[in-house]
From Swiss-Prot:
This is Pro-apoptotic serine protease NMA111. One of its GO terms (cellular component) is nucleus. The lineage of its organism: Eukaryota, Fungi, Dikarya, Ascomycota, Saccharomycotina. It comes from Kluyveromyces lactis (strain ATCC 8585 / CBS 2359 / DSM 70799 / NBRC 1267 / NRRL Y-1140 / WM37) (Yeast). Its EC number is 3.4.21.-. The gene is NMA111. Residues 79-269 are annotated as: Serine protease.
Length: 985
């Protein structure tokens, strides 16, 4: 696993406002946001501690080290490495796989203490590795609503070779100057021991930024131990072997670390041990510790300061109100800047006192005294229940997760704790591609959704495939309400479930809410299509009537294409039958939703009817009866464009604005788009057109047309290596055979010579052994370009007689090969039985002319995927076969979830699974047969092969509750995709 410095969960850094140092929490979470940390003035020790720290000069350094060695040897048996997955995005936390540390605090009950940001607020699965490398599953039994600690539970009877012991918690031993050790899983290592000295006991909780988890209303302990990712949850121990604090965070630019005091942990542990509820009270107010001089400036009277300094001689400040949540118990009572004097008559100087009173007063009325403007102000306030305003359930629908807005999120902006929070803005509710967090839903389908239950009731009434209006806002900008239309997808994302936390089992139980409602009938719509603003050419102006925008939404990764919405210009090929041609970068396969829009007024569904394996175009079909608009079938040219020809570019800019420009062809060349790091569809073996116009670089799609309105070429965008976009023209003559077959009511099929080609100069051809008579023939017959076509690669095949890299193509079936399109393949229909035919190639290989019979092949598109352990598996698609010389298995990994078991245990994208439990898995059928026999929550052995043919093996534990095995298969007759659940929990 890659180790990064993050929130001491291997975590992300955050910037300190005053010291300009970045803070981190110490575990293995590589996906957290960054922000600032408030740094205060150094204070003295707590008021009940002795200021003078004795210096032990009587013991030698040797004796001290020996004592530490003895202590550490005992402590390490209580420390565990936690490997975990936060399964689903929830509240402030993203879905992730990570590592952290914990330590045993009750060996009999099997209770492990770790951080709250490790346990997480949402679904969790994990296991603990003990000092002797025994492993045991852990379940979460408590996560504090505010403070950064939680408890995991394991079954001690499952451990056979180690006798675990618990660390004793003694928070009172934490003193300034004390030498400590942090024993944990630092930087992802099995065991690290870091030393340091406590420098502060009264630091405010570090602030890790907005829209992420932050502790508050507690003091933190500060020390210099230089802990890093993976040490979250480590015990901070004294030389006597007592745990005095819990490692939580630190600075990534300094050696400073932040520890959580254990006072509230001790109380919570006692409640768990005695099977009592852990009550947590709140008045929905955040307090911060401020020094006396600042308190005076905020309104603390001199008498109150004098009294506080006398009563708490070790303290240098008091608690001041920082944020009061609207509609909370203290709203319109406490004000920002108020200095807290007492609660129920008890003078207050620390957060621990506040927690003690609130936690024991849930539902009761308390009397609070604050100072404001040098005057005492007293009021009564009813203590609320923190657990009630902490979400314990969420809804999954349309590929997104929702729950009630949490106290944790609302506190950042002093908002009321209410509303429907979007935990994962994905699927239908991908509200803003640039911002994925912080969204709150206000209205759906013109119905208000103030609570999660209201949201559920509204979603129950919405049919599949309906477009509804959603009003929403972001927590960072509550003044701005945004409006968008959402396509309700209940066919790709069929689940409509509610998950509820079960603290007894540690599992989030789910139940199905309702089945999807069938789609409503689509009614024809009318639209006006405006002419292009070309006053001197009415025929060109009418070309807008043949153009549309094709929209695609990919629901699941297939062929290594990530699920995301795309759109681009389409050309109507046949207005009566509804055929539209579009770049394959917008329609990469047919496991998606496709729509066609006209004049930015009508949007109708479409289906994929043809995908060209190499030429980078797709053809979709919509129902023309649904479009009441003057859509026109254009005239396609019969002659090819040549270099120097004048033409007109008409295309859609990235904003979907239609523009046009006079231009000319400045080149026609051969092109194969370079491979991506992860193989995916790419255009190969094309004859492409380039034009003399900068406007083409601003348009991802369009057409080239003659002055009389005849379409000469399709302007396409191709995805290349490292997300680079290639823009080029494809002559319409190259697509006419396919178009004619479709217009005739048949299904086109293409059979190709499956190899990679490129052009070489006559000089290179002569050097590599092409006979002079062939060079002379090329010079005589070629008019525009003098070149030969050479083989650059050979796709994976079992056919023995094949082209080899370096071959120079002289002729095919006796015809001189002058350009790439001369070896473009055979176009036919699905009725043709001989579409895969043999072609007679004459090539130069190793400076010798030889004849080859090369069989053309049909490229099969993907029709089946399997999701196992959160990993999407399929047969290797064509892009993989184009670059591989051997295929180890037909079980190929194209994607894995950010919280998946596949990621946790080490299945990489582009791996091949060759064996499961030592049984060969040459194909998906065999793979499914084997994994069906693997019980839930058990280990299986996987043997894999990397893309570079390096074999390795891993073990993986199944979890069918969160990661079921699912098959998605295309029905060859209807073209629809059917989901089948393979595993049962």
């Amino acid at each position: 696993m890659t180790v990064e410095l993050k929130r001491n969960l291997l975590e992300s850094s955050v910037e300190d406002i005053d010291l300009e140092s970045k803070k981190q929490r110490v575990d293995n979470d590589v996906d957290q946001n960054t922000s600032s940390v408030d740094e205060d003035i150094d204070y003295e020790e707590d008021y009940d501690e002795v200021n003078d720290v004795p210096i032990d000069s009587g013991n030698s350094l040797f004796n001290n080290n020996a004592k530490w060695q003895e202590t550490i040897s005992k402590v390490v048996k209580s420390v565990v490495s936690i490997h975990f997955s936060q399964v689903a995005p929830f509240d402030s936390e993203a879905a992730l796989v990570s590592e952290a540390t914990g330590f045993i605090v009750d060996a009999k009950l099997g209770i492990i203490l770790t951080n709250r940001h490790v346990v997480g607020p949402g679904p969790f699965i994990g296991y603990a590795i003990f000092d002797n490398h025994e492993e045991c599953d852990v379940i979460p039994i408590y996560r504090d609503p505010v403070h950064d600690f939680g408890f995991l539970k394991f079954d001690p009877s499952k451990l056979k070779y180690i006798e675990v012991t618990a660390l004793e918690l003694k928070p009172s031993l934490a003193k300034v100057g004390s030498e400590i050790r942090v024993v944990g899983n630092d930087a992802g290592e099995k065991l690290s021991i870091l030393s340091g000295f406590i420098s502060r006991l009264d630091r405010n909780a570090p602030d890790y930024g907005e829209l992420t988890y932050n502790d508050f209303n507690t003091e933190y302990i500060q020390a210099a131990a230089a802990a890093s990712g993976g040490s979250s949850g480590s015990p901070v121990i004294t030389v006597e072997g007592y745990a005095v604090a819990l490692q939580a965070g630190g600075s990534s630019e300094a050696s400073t670390d932040f520890f959580l005091p254990l006072d509230r942990v001790v109380r919570a542990l006692q409640c768990v041990q005695t099977d009592k509820p852990i009550t947590r009270g709140t008045i929905q107010t955040q307090w911060v510790l401020k020094p006396f001089d600042e308190c005076r400036r905020l309104g603390l009277s001199e008498d109150r300061e004098k009294e506080a300094r006398k009563r708490f001689p070790g303290k240098t400040g008091l608690l001041v109100a920082e944020a009061i949540l609207r509609e909370g118990p203290a709203y319109n009572k406490v004000q920002e800047g108020d200095t807290l004097i007492s609660i129920n008559g008890t003078p207050i100087c620390s957060f621990i006192q506040v927690d003690n009173i609130l936690d024991s007063s849930v539902g009761d009325e308390i009397i609070i005294v604050v100072q404001r403007g040098s005057k005492d102000i007293s009021f009564r306030c009813t203590v609320g229940d923190l657990h009630i305003i902490t979400p314990s359930r969420y809804v999954e629908v349309c590929g997104a997760n929702f729950h009630e807005l949490s106290y944790q999120m609302a506190r950042c902006y002093a908002l009321p704790v209410k509303g429907v929070f979007v935990a994962s803005a994905t699927g239908s509710f991908d509200l803003d591609p640039k911002e994925k967090t912080g969204w709150v839903i206000d209205f759906v389908d013109n119905k208000e959704t103030p609570t999660l239950d209201d949201f559920i009731e509204v979603m129950k009434t919405i049919p599949d495939e309906k477009r509804v209006i959603v009003k929403f806002h972001n927590l960072t900008d509550v003044q701005t309400q945004r409006i968008t239309s959402v396509y309700i997808d209940r066919h790709w994302c069929s689940e409509f479930r509610i998950y509820t936390r079960n603290d007894k089992t540690g599992i989030w139980d789910y139940e199905k809410i309702t089945e999807k409602l069938p789609p409503l009938p689509i009614k024809p719509q009318k639209a006006k299509i405006l002419d292009l603003p070309i006053n001197d050419n009415k025929k060109l102006a009418k070309m807008s009537h043949s153009l549309c925008v094709v929209h695609s939404v990919i629901a699941i990764t297939m062929d290594s294409m990530e699920p995301e919405p795309t759109n681009g210009c389409g050309l109507v090929l046949d207005a009566e039958k509804g055929y539209v041609i579009v770049s394959r970068s917008f329609v990469p396969h047919d496991c998606l939703n496709t729509f066609v829009s006209f004049a930015e007024s009508i949007l109708v569904p479409a289906k994929v009817v043809f995908l060209h394996p190499t030429q980078n175009y797709a053809i979709v079909q919509y129902d023309p009866s649904l479009v009441d608009a003057p859509v026109c079938t254009p005239v396609l040219a019969n002659e090819r464009l040549e270099r120097g020809d004048e033409t007109n570019f008409i295309g859609y800019m990235y904003s979907n604005t239609l523009i046009s420009s006079k231009t000319k062809v400045n080149g026609i060349s051969s092109l194969s788009v370079p491979n991506d790091i992860i193989p995916r569809y790419r255009a190969t073996n094309l004859e492409v057109i380039s034009i003399d116009s900068n406007i083409s670089t601003k348009c991802k799609s369009g057409i080239l047309a003659a002055d009389d309105g005849t379409v000469r070429a399709i302007w396409l965008s191709c995805m290349g290596n490292k997300e680079k976009l290639y823009l080029m023209g494809l002559d319409v003559v190259d697509i006419k055979e396919v178009v004619d077959i479709l217009r005739a009511g048949k299904n086109p099929k293409v059979s190709i010579v499956d190899a990679g080609f490129d052009s070489i100069s006559l000089l290179q051809a002569r050097i590599r052994g092409v006979p002079e008579e062939w060079i002379k023939m090329m010079e005589e017959e070629s008019e525009n370009r003098l070149q030969f076509i050479s083989v650059t690669r050979n796709s994976y095949t079992t056919i023995k007689e094949r082209l080899e890299p370096g071959d120079i193509i002289l002729s095919v079936n006796g015809k001189l090969v002058k350009r790439m399109r001369d070896i473009g393949g055979v176009v036919g229909t699905d009725d043709d039985t001989d579409i895969e035919s043999e072609l007679l190639f004459k090539v130069v290989r190793d400076a010798k002319v030889i004849d080859l019979k090369i069989k053309t092949v049909q490229i099969e598109e993907t029709t089946r995927i399997v999701v196992f352990a959160g990993c999407v598996l399929q047969a290797p698609h064509h892009a993989v076969r184009q670059v591989k010389t051997s295929i180890p298995s037909e079980v190929y990994a194209v994607s894995r979830g950010t919280s998946s078991l596949a990621l946790q245990y080490g299945i990489e994208v582009t791996n091949f699974i060759t064996h499961v439990n030592d049984q060969s898995t040459p194909d998906l059928d065999t793979f499914l047969k084997v994994v069906k026999e693997i019980p839930d929550n058990t280990y299986c052995k996987l043997r894999l092969m990397t893309f570079d043919d390096v074999p390795f093996a891993i073990s993986l534990k199944t979890n069918y509750h969160y990661f079921p095995t699912v098959e998605l298969r295309k029905n060859p007759k209807t073209g629809s995709w059917i989901e089948n659940d393979i595993s049962e929990t």
